[in-house]
Regions:
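Positively charged n-region of N-terminal signal peptides that target proteins for export
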Residues: 1-5
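Bacterial N-terminal signal peptides
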Residues: 7-16
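Active-site rim/loop-helix segments in enzyme catalytic domains that contact anionic ligands
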Residues: 21-148, 171, 178-182
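Aromatic-Pro/Gly-enriched surface loop or interdomain linker
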Residues: 590-671, 702-704, 811, 829-842
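A glycine-rich, often tryptophan-bearing local segment used as a flexible ligand/cofactor-contacting loop or short
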Residues: 673-755
Length: 843
């Protein structure tokens, strides 16, 4: 039995890597595990700031060992992070990280919630964070989440008493949780949000502490632990064939875009919880001690508990279907209790168990991935009763409207199939993340539908309800309509079904820089999402920009095909920046959307409709040099940005670097974190520095502190120590302290105005110590901190130059910040006032 449990449980976990929509097959061990959860009426809520902040060990322990309903409330969706597996950043990264969180919860058994807070990047303190987030709005979201989820215990990941010692988002999440703990039960607090919920008072609030928060293991061992609970989260689950930490490691490993793939850990391990509010449990190994978590918690629950506790005690692992009659009876009694909260939760759990013990397979799917409002689609229904119990399918409804009303006996292992043709309402919303439907602010998403706030994702467009009769009791079971197809290399795949426009358009470049008056061709690609689509496309642009044509026609025969149209755009003669929007006109509808698909094996494919627009900038910029060699680090879009202002950029494979191989380039640029992630640089650094010594320019962008120190003794030709210094306020004052240096004079004059309009931050991981050969160019600081001069350093080396910069060009250039382009051009141009054009670089 244990071997069977292992196989089935691993299949469930690994299945999330193929498609999160795939129906799960439940072993008797899985069903028994769910019955244990069914018989526990207690709830825990974990609160932190970002995807991957959560302690999956504790979430898994609460869900799988305690059997509590366990949720994770993440303040943000992680939009401000970086992406180690693909190109998605900002809003699109938030969509990906949302799905990775949901994948993690499918593994550890938790549920997922969010507030409307945006991950706007690193913040040094909660004061800044809460100002940008709009504290009252996000506090209201936390209060509402508590009222809806109704946790008995809340666990904070971070300490609310230590502002400035960690990410401001981290501390803010804990501060909001502490405040919301009491406000959730105050009817005068956020009373406008009580329409669909009610006040709630959690019993206990904990801080998930560890030795790390004390500074060292030695200090933690000596600390007063009188207010600490400790639980062994290394427990082994014989029924599942895995330990708690193995499950937790698999859950954490869903955060692939953040590089959280990790090895499993095994063995006993303690987790500590500091009581912040509420009474101290007598048993310091039980968060729920003294809280009624049995069926007697709800009026009328004693009869239900008597039935379900007996099912648990006498569970038949060889034939779980023998419990069907008792489970149906418990379901029937459950419908009569007055506590709507527990009725809804436990009815959902109980229906899933009934479906599993009866061997029922119910699904509704389409064989097309998407369609349009007003179009017809076919929904395929399948129902199989794989037991000898009498089960009747009485009817099937789609979104509440009955579409099949012919009672059918589901005979043992006989497949029932039916096709339903339905029409998508013309008023149907397009598929997409609800939090991106409207333009938000720097710190918050704009969501007008209050019922959606907190949900991890937008509910899918179609839901099929199978109305069944089991043991004489009517039981409705809902199934989301999915898209199902097969691939020879992957087999059966389930993905979400999408509703999309008839056509969308895409501007090839999101930022278009005009460095002079020369017109540029603007490609616009139209993609059809139905057969035989024709219409026109127009571009909208600001004043003083001239288009060669107001609109152009297109015609596309096949769904999924594309057609590219070319417009010519002439910039104004003076510096200017504006937006450029493409609009598709079809059948009286104007569509200014680009369809972005996010597809990875470990999460369901996501369709996001983003504004089809670009930023166009007329920039009076000068440059010297033509050919740039770029050594990619962790990944950035700087090369594409440099090509926008006329440079030819060649990506260099570090393995190909040899003596003299770099001499054909006018400058060598190393991408972000190159010395952290490109091990070959350890052996190629001599050639890079020799290139500078012989007259070249080497530009090194930021690397994180600590990692390279033991690997590279000569990241620079002179002494240079990288710190964790950073300036997170993108609007902080910048002083030019080396006013005569070429970096701020040639070929573009740099003034404080060139630091206007920067995004997210000034920079990060600035050096704090350097030799006298280096000249610091800029001075800046965050509020309340000492000024730092290490953001941009330049040193002559032999006949050339070495530049180290922690300025966030990897963010500013793709965002089209004019001053960032001018400054980077100066960096590339240094020492080239008498440049002799180098021979054409091949490739």
């Amino acid at each position: 039995m244990r071997r069977i449990a292992i196989v089935f449980f691993l299949c469930i976990l690994l299945g999330t890597h193929l498609s999160a929509q795939t129906p799960k097959n439940h072993s008797p061990a899985d069903i028994y595990h769910e019955i244990q959860k069914l018989n526990f009426l207690g709830t825990a809520l974990y609160i932190a700031a970002h995807p991957d902040d959560e302690n999956t060990r504790l979430i898994s322990y609460l869900s799988n060992n305690v059997h509590a309903r366990t949720g994770y409330l993440s303040m943000t969706r992680g939009d401000g992070g970086q992406n180690l597996i693909g190109p998605e950043l900002r809003e699109l990264l938030g969509v990906l990280r949302t799905q990775e969180l949901l994948a993690a919860r499918r593994v550890d058994g938790g549920e997922q919630m969010f507030t409307r807070a945006v991950d706007f990047g690193y913040s040094k303190n909660p004061k800044e964070t809460l100002e940008i987030w709009d504290k009252d709005m996000i506090l209201g979201d936390v209060v509402t989440a508590i009222r809806k989820f109704k946790p008995d215990v809340i666990v904070n990941r971070f300490d609310h008493r230590s502002p400035g010692t960690t990410h401001g988002h981290h501390t803010s999440s804990a501060m909001l949780s502490v405040e919301a703990f009491d406000l959730a039960n105050d009817p005068t607090a956020f009373s406008d949000r009580l329409e669909n919920t009610e006040t709630w008072q959690p019993k206990r609030l904990f801080f998930n502490t560890s030795w790390w928060f004390y500074g060292s293991q030695e200090k933690f061992e000596k600390a007063d632990k009188s207010r600490l609970l400790n639980v062994d989260i290394g427990t082994y689950y014989p029924m599942l064939g895995m330990s708690n930490n193995e499950i937790a490691s698999l859950a954490s490993s869903q955060h692939l875009c953040q590089g959280f793939g990790r090895l499993s850990s095994r063995g006993s391990e303690e987790e500590y919880l500091e009581l912040l509010k509420g009474n101290m449990p007598k048993n310091k190994e039980n968060l729920f001690e003294g809280i009624n978590t049995t069926w007697t918690r709800v009026e009328g629950g004693d009869k239900i508990g008597a039935i379900l506790n007996k099912v648990e005690a006498d569970f038949n692992f060889k034939d779980p279907s023998v419990h069907l009659a008792d489970l149906v009876k418990a379901y029937q009694l459950l419908q009569d209790i007055g506590d709507e909260h527990w009725k809804e939760l436990k009815s959902k759990e109980l229906k899933a168990i009934i479906e599993e013990v009866a061997g029922l397979h119910l699904e509704a799917f389409t064989t097309q991935g998407y369609s349009n409002p007003g179009e017809s689609i076919v929904i395929n229904l399948e129902a199989v009763n794989r037991s000898n119990k009498k089960i009747k399918l009485e009817s099937v409804s789609i979104n509440g409207e009955t579409k099949l009303n012919e009672p059918i006996d589901l005979k043992d292992n006989q497949l029932f199939r039916k096709e339903l043709k339905i029409t998508i309402p013309k008023s149907a919303d397009y598929t997409g993340p609800y939090w991106l439907m409207e333009k938000g602010t720097l710190g918050t998403y704009s969501v007008t539908n209050m019922d959606l706030i907190g949900k991890p994702e937008t509910p899918r467009a179609f839901k099929a309800t199978f109305n069944l009769n089991l043991e004489g009791v009517s039981i409705p079971i809902d199934k989301t309509v999915s898209y199902k197809y097969g691939r020879p290399d992957k087999g059966e795949i389930y993905q979400p079904f999408e509703i999309v426009p008839k056509a969308t358009s895409k501007l090839q470049d999101k930022v278009i820089i005009f460095s002079d008056d020369t017109p540029k061709q603007i490609p616009v690609t139209i993609k059809s999402h139905k057969d035989n689509v024709s219409g026109s496309v127009s571009l909208k642009v600001g004043q003083n920009w001239i288009l060669d044509s107001p609109s152009q026609s297109f015609s596309i025969e096949k769904k999924g095909d594309e057609q590219t149209l070319i417009f010519t755009l002439t910039p104004p003669s003076s510096e200017n920046e504006t937006s450029l929007t493409s609009v598709v006109h079809i059948d009286g509808e104007d569509i200014s959307k680009e369809m972005v698909t996010i597809a990875y094996d470990h999460v369901p494919t996501q369709t996001v409709l983003m504004p089809s627009e670009a930023k166009v900038v007329r920039l009076n910029i000068h440059k010297a040099g033509e050919n740039i060699g770029y050594i990619m680090g962790a990944g950035d879009d700087v090369p594409t940005s440099l090509e926008q202002i006329g440079y030819t950029v060649h990506t260099i494979n570090p393995a190909d670097i040899s003596e003299g191989s770099l001499q054909k380039y006018d400058a060598i640029v190393l991408g972000i974190r190159a010395y952290n992630v490109v091990n070959e640089l350890n052996f190629k650094q001599k050639y890079i520095l020799d290139y500078a010594k012989q007259g070249g320019t080497v530009i090194v962008q930021y690397n994180t502190a600590g990692r390279w120190a033991n690997q590279f003794e000569n990241i620079a030709p002179y002494e240079l120590e990288i710190s964790r210094d950073r300036v997170t306020n993108e609007n902080s004052e910048v002083k030019i302290i080396a006013k005569d240096n070429d970096l701020v004079n040639y070929p573009n004059k740099i003034t404080p105005d060139d630091f206007q309009g920067w995004v997210q931050e000034r920079g990060l991981y600035f050096p704090d110590k350097w030799s006298s050969e280096f000249t610091p160019i800029l001075e800046m600081q965050d509020e309340g901190e000492s000024a730092t001069k290490g953001s941009l350093l330049v040193a002559p080396y032999g006949e050339g130059h070495y530049i180290y910069t922690g300025l966030s060009f990897f963010r500013e250039l793709p965002a089209g910040v004019p001053g960032a382009y001018k400054l980077f051009s100066n960096m590339l141009s240094i020492g080239k006032d008498n440049l002799t054009k180098k021979e054409q670089v091949k490739g």
